[in-house]
Amino acid sequence: MNTHPQTSPNTHYKIADISLADWGRKEIDIAEHEMPGLMSIRRKYASKQPLKGVRVTGSLHMTIQTAVLIETLKDIGANVRWASCNIFSTQDHAAAAIATSGTPVFAWKGETLEEYWDCTLQALTFTLADGTLTGPELIVDDGGDATLLIHKGYELENGSTWVDEPSDSLEEQVIKRLLKRIAIERPGYWTRVVNDWKGVSEETTTGVHRLYQIAATGRLLVPAINVNDSVTKSKFDNLYGCRESLADGLKRAMDVMLAGKLAVVCGYGDVGKGSAHSLRAYGARVIVTEIDPICALQAAMEGFEVRTVEDTLGQADIYVTTTGNKDVIRIEHMTAMKDQVIVCNIGHFDNEIQVDALNTLTGVQKINIKPQVDKFILPNGNTLFLLAEGRLVNLGCATGHPSFVMSNSFANQTLAQIDLWQNKDVYEKNVYRLPKKLDEEVARLHLEKIGVKLTTLTANQAAYLGISVEGPFKPEHYRY
């Protein structure tokens, strides 16, 4: 952990080490060649400037790939401020390169929870020409933390007592303390923010779930675009990205041979599918746990055993949570696991594993092995290794998904930002998805890079199917 992040005199950035900028720039240059979707969008929209002067806050992993996204948003006119959406996911050389280029960025690997939420606040804080503090007009969110902070702050200014209610977690306590401080230091701030805020595009399953929950209660403050459920995001980033990055995280963290190990993957959605296939590709024997009969049947038809966590205790060598739910691996599970077990998470939040309960377990001994690898000696004498403190193992212990697959996701994010701004007076306060035509276009932008040549329908074939020669080729209800 870097406990003394570097800042600029004008609060332009707060990062680990500005001297890493040259290294970061070299890797950004490499990534650009692997991100044809984003680079094509730059070329298409650079002269049109569809986001000219628009204040955009990003709360998304500050990686090399995200740096390419940030510079794409800037190239099409946006005024950008950025923070990471995870305390461990920042690549410090990427943050340094972005800071050097003039973008305000507040992120470093190994933030405390207090630092993390303060960075989110700084990314949300813009200063107008007259010195007035205001917020973004658009948000690029990943997990929904920036969206959550604005909603909770606005509700506090409108009579909510949530900040005085008992907290379910340490992180919730941190959020409440921050909101109380802002209420004193910046009275009426969140109302000003909401008055200017026009929309949010959400990157991940967990954040989308939050949006639908808020929308169902009628409390959603702005239109939102669900980027996660674009086919070129969920079926690529979530599936193929995890298929490569999970094993990378495990290998870098533990230097362990996966072949022959018994691994349990909790959840068989798109992330779970990618994770299960990642482990099996290395020769691990994989068991899947599921609550959904459809996903369970899919796993079984792929040749995976489907059991419960309880059935695997004392047998499995590795546990990976992928669900987006809470309390998937509980303290009673961890104390019953075999000696030398590895436990990690590749879902968005750390509450999939009862990390707080493990840290406070009577008689437990915690030993830090290296950054993001902790050894717990349990009261029964067994050892458990927890990776990335229960947060995203692929970003905490490795570098996340490869650039090519992230080009799909970030092309969707950029198109969503353009769509939100162009239709800010049209969209209602609800959750939307990008049209299938744009989904197909994102895929099309990536084909040449990998040597794909599409077959073209004849006019007669298109008429027979009842579609256009140019697409869309599938109905909205089609399951890819």
UniProtKB/Swiss-Prot annotation:
<dbReference type="GO" id="GO:0071269">
    <property type="term" value="P:L-homocysteine biosynthetic process"/>
</dbReference>
<comment type="similarity">
    <text>Belongs to the adenosylhomocysteinase family.</text>
</comment>
<feature type="binding site">
    <location>
        <begin position="346"/>
        <end position="348"/>
    </location>
    <ligand>
        <name>NAD(+)</name>
    </ligand>
</feature>
<dbReference type="GO" id="GO:0006730">
    <property type="term" value="P:one-carbon metabolic process"/>
</dbReference>
<protein>
    <recommendedName>
        <fullName>Adenosylhomocysteinase</fullName>
        <ecNumber>3.13.2.1</ecNumber>
    </recommendedName>
</protein>
<dbReference type="InterPro" id="IPR015878">
    <property type="entry name" value="Ado_hCys_hydrolase_NAD-bd"/>
</dbReference>
<feature type="binding site">
    <location>
        <position position="63"/>
    </location>
    <ligand>
        <name>substrate</name>
    </ligand>
</feature>
<feature type="binding site">
    <location>
        <position position="394"/>
    </location>
    <ligand>
        <name>NAD(+)</name>
    </ligand>
</feature>
<feature type="binding site">
    <location>
        <position position="237"/>
    </location>
    <ligand>
        <name>substrate</name>
    </ligand>
</feature>
<dbReference type="InterPro" id="IPR042172">
    <property type="entry name" value="Adenosylhomocyst_ase-like_sf"/>
</dbReference>
<feature type="binding site">
    <location>
        <begin position="204"/>
        <end position="206"/>
    </location>
    <ligand>
        <name>NAD(+)</name>
    </ligand>
</feature>
<dbReference type="Pfam" id="PF00670">
    <property type="entry name" value="AdoHcyase_NAD"/>
</dbReference>
<dbReference type="GO" id="GO:0005829">
    <property type="term" value="C:cytosol"/>
</dbReference>
<comment type="function">
    <text>May play a key role in the regulation of the intracellular concentration of adenosylhomocysteine.</text>
</comment>
<feature type="binding site">
    <location>
        <position position="238"/>
    </location>
    <ligand>
        <name>NAD(+)</name>
    </ligand>
</feature>
<feature type="binding site">
    <location>
        <position position="233"/>
    </location>
    <ligand>
        <name>substrate</name>
    </ligand>
</feature>
<dbReference type="Pfam" id="PF05221">
    <property type="entry name" value="AdoHcyase"/>
</dbReference>
<feature type="binding site">
    <location>
        <position position="325"/>
    </location>
    <ligand>
        <name>NAD(+)</name>
    </ligand>
</feature>
<comment type="pathway">
    <text>Amino-acid biosynthesis; L-homocysteine biosynthesis; L-homocysteine from S-adenosyl-L-homocysteine: step 1/1.</text>
</comment>
<keyword id="KW-0554">One-carbon metabolism</keyword>
<feature type="binding site">
    <location>
        <begin position="267"/>
        <end position="272"/>
    </location>
    <ligand>
        <name>NAD(+)</name>
    </ligand>
</feature>
<dbReference type="GO" id="GO:0033353">
    <property type="term" value="P:S-adenosylmethionine cycle"/>
</dbReference>
<keyword id="KW-0378">Hydrolase</keyword>
<feature type="binding site">
    <location>
        <position position="290"/>
    </location>
    <ligand>
        <name>NAD(+)</name>
    </ligand>
</feature>
<dbReference type="InterPro" id="IPR036291">
    <property type="entry name" value="NAD(P)-bd_dom_sf"/>
</dbReference>
<keyword id="KW-0520">NAD</keyword>
<dbReference type="InterPro" id="IPR000043">
    <property type="entry name" value="Adenosylhomocysteinase-like"/>
</dbReference>
<feature type="binding site">
    <location>
        <position position="142"/>
    </location>
    <ligand>
        <name>substrate</name>
    </ligand>
</feature>
<dbReference type="InterPro" id="IPR020082">
    <property type="entry name" value="S-Ado-L-homoCys_hydrolase_CS"/>
</dbReference>
<feature type="binding site">
    <location>
        <position position="203"/>
    </location>
    <ligand>
        <name>substrate</name>
    </ligand>
</feature>
<keyword id="KW-0963">Cytoplasm</keyword>
<dbReference type="GO" id="GO:0004013">
    <property type="term" value="F:adenosylhomocysteinase activity"/>
</dbReference>
